[in-house]
């Protein structure tokens, strides 16, 4: 799921979240709508980094 694009979902809330960007190998912020979306959605940058950067699950695809 670290390779999924950022997806704000279908609802209209304005919730700051983070997603992993494999092109830059970094976690970036985006605005989540509150429902829907996908699993590339983290409450904190640290959680995103731990899941996708530090674990080796992220990075450019070979």
Curated annotation (Swiss-Prot):
It is found in: Secreted. GO terms for cellular component: extracellular space. CDD domains: Kunitz_PPTI-like. The record marks 12-13 as: Reactive bond for trypsin. Residues 2-52 form the BPTI/Kunitz inhibitor domain. Disulfide bonds join 2-52, 11-35, 27-48. Its main location: secreted. InterPro entries: Kunitz_BPTI, Kunitz_BPTI_sf, Prtase_inh_Kunz-CS, TFPI/VKTCI-like. GO terms for molecular function: potassium channel regulator activity; serine-type endopeptidase inhibitor activity; toxin activity. Serine protease inhibitor that inhibits trypsin. The recombinant protein also barely blocks voltage-gated potassium channel Kv1.3/KCNA3 (3.70% inhibition at 60 nM of toxin). Belongs to the venom Kunitz-type family. This is Kunitz-type serine protease inhibitor. It comes from Eristicophis macmahoni.
């Amino acid at each position: 799921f670290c390779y999924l694009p950022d997806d704000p979902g279908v609802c209209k809330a304005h919730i700051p979240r983070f997603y992993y960007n494999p092109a830059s190998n970094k976690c970036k912020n985006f605005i989540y709508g509150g429902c829907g979306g996908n699993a590339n959605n983290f409450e904190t940058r640290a959680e995103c980094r731990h899941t996708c950067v530090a674990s080796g699950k992220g990075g450019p695809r070979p």
